[in-house]
Amino acid sequence: MEYAELLKRLTVDCKDDGKQFRKKDRIHEIKALLENSGYELLGEGSLSLLYGKPMEEENTYRTLVSSHVDCVYKNCFAKDEDELCWKGTFDNSATNAAVIDLMLRGELDESVLVAFTGDEEKDSAGAIEIMQMLGRMECLVGKALVLDVTNEGWEDEAAFSIENDHGFDIITGYHIVELLQASGASCVFVHEAEPDETWEYSKGSSSDLPGIPCLSPVSYTHLRAHETPEHL
């Protein structure tokens, strides 16, 4: 399935009251898309889904990719305006579609966990649920990537921005910059952007589950149709 079709399917309503999902159209689509994908639903909370490849030992997962599914739009839509542009309500279906595209194409390492969370627009209760799940699994992931859509890169005409980096060592930081430069995709760094799930993941949930080094690779809201999911 092409990214464009995934984007259309996932740009549907999903809302919560801070305790549980009240509109679950996008949740249903995610479950349907991943049903025969080789990924297993490892955990489901009132505000979260956690997927991963089946592993003999749960503590062998190394990376968490988190993409929130709650939206603030009254009416969700996705429309192909022309060959270059899409028009629609893409916060945060754009990155939901991007990570699911990578999952379906087998582009993620088997050590990667993928979380879909609610309540990101307010208190990040979905991210807190994910941290609790990781604690029960005794899973100490080494880093988290939080995907979102903002307008931080708009003035710089960047394809995406790197926001709210927490806890990454300088060697990892240089490595990320090298990879970005090699990709040719333009980006900007915003070290202290609006609060997002990185603030919860970086705090940890207990002494047994310390904070996770994390950052947010963020697409800006003017999504161009010719960009591939790797740019998001």
Identify the role of each PLM range.
Residues 36-44, 84, 185-191:
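Short secondary-structure junctions
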Residues 9-59:
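A non-catalytic alpha/beta surface segment that caps or lines the substrate-entry region
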Residues 221-230:
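Conserved small/polar residues in nucleotide/adenosyl-binding loops
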Residues 88-181, 185-207:
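Acidic/histidine-rich catalytic neighborhood of metal-dependent amide-processing enzymes
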Residues 67-72, 147-151, 220:
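Short glycine-enriched loops at secondary-structure junctions
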Residues 33, 43, 59-116:
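Active-site metal-coordination/substrate-binding segment of hydrolases
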Residues 41, 114, 144-146, 212-216:
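Conserved beta-strand scaffold positions in the cores of enzyme catalytic domains, especially
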